[in-house]
């Protein structure tokens, strides 16, 4: 979502609360519960899952491995659910030409640096950069080059849904708004 006026451009970023993350967190949680249930069934010697005859699975080595996969899956699933709950990666980019300030805010993981807040002067922006990598795993990332600070990504590095036309359009609009050149690498 964007909000734009003559002097201010605010772009809100979604973060980790995406449908795909919810989907994979649910699938991983349910799958790991299934593995753990099969491992527990083989240990107890009782059929806890009516669909699968898990009494035929020996506890050592198959039941141990299934239990290990179930526990590992629960840990990974809990990590995904925590990133969704904390909404890691969400935030905003605010470009204010009137004040001459650019603010970049992102939510991180809990701790001392949970709130990531970067502030720059518009006159320190050297250029807007576009990185394009084609092939099996295409990447199109928009960067802002800051004098003395290096480059800062403005789009998510895992965002593969930008077509070349969309990323060019976004870079051109932002460069025009900030009155800086565009570089492609």
From Swiss-Prot:
Spans traversing the lipid bilayer: 21-43, 63-85
Major place of residence: plastid
GO cellular component, one term: photosystem I
InterPro entries linked to this entry: PSI_Ycf4_assembly
Subcellular location(s) per record: Plastid, Chloroplast thylakoid membrane
UniProt KW keywords: Chloroplast, Membrane, Photosynthesis, Plastid, Thylakoid, Transmembrane, Transmembrane helix
Record function comment: Seems to be required for the assembly of the photosystem I complex.
Xref: HAMAP family: Ycf4 (MF_00437)
Protein family membership: Belongs to the Ycf4 family.
Protein name: Photosystem I assembly protein Ycf4
Organism: Zea mays (Maize)
Taxonomic placement: Eukaryota, Viridiplantae, Streptophyta, Embryophyta, Tracheophyta
Name of the gene this protein is made from: ycf4
């Amino acid at each position: 979502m964007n909000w734009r006026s003559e002097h201010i451009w605010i772009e809100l970023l979604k973060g980790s609360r995406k449908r795909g993350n919810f989907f994979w967190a649910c699938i991983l949680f349910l799958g790991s519960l299934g593995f753990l249930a099969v491992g527990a069934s083989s240990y107890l010697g009782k059929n806890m899952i009516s669909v699968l005859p898990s009494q035929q699975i020996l506890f050592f080595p198959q039941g141990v491995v299934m239990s290990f996969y179930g526990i590992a899956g629960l840990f990974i699933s809990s990590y995904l659910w925590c990133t969704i709950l904390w909404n890691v990666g969400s935030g905003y980019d605010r470009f204010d030409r009137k004040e001459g300030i650019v603010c970049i805010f992102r939510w991180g993981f809990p701790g001392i640096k949970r709130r990531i807040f970067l502030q720059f002067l518009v006159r320190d922006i050297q250029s807007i950069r576009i990185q394009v990598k084609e092939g099996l795993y295409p990447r199109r990332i928009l960067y802002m080059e800051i004098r003395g600070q290096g480059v800062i990504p403005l789009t998510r590095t895992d965002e593969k849904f930008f077509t070349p036309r969309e990323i060019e359009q976004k870079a051109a609009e932002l460069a025009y708004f900030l009155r800086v050149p565009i570089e492609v690498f």
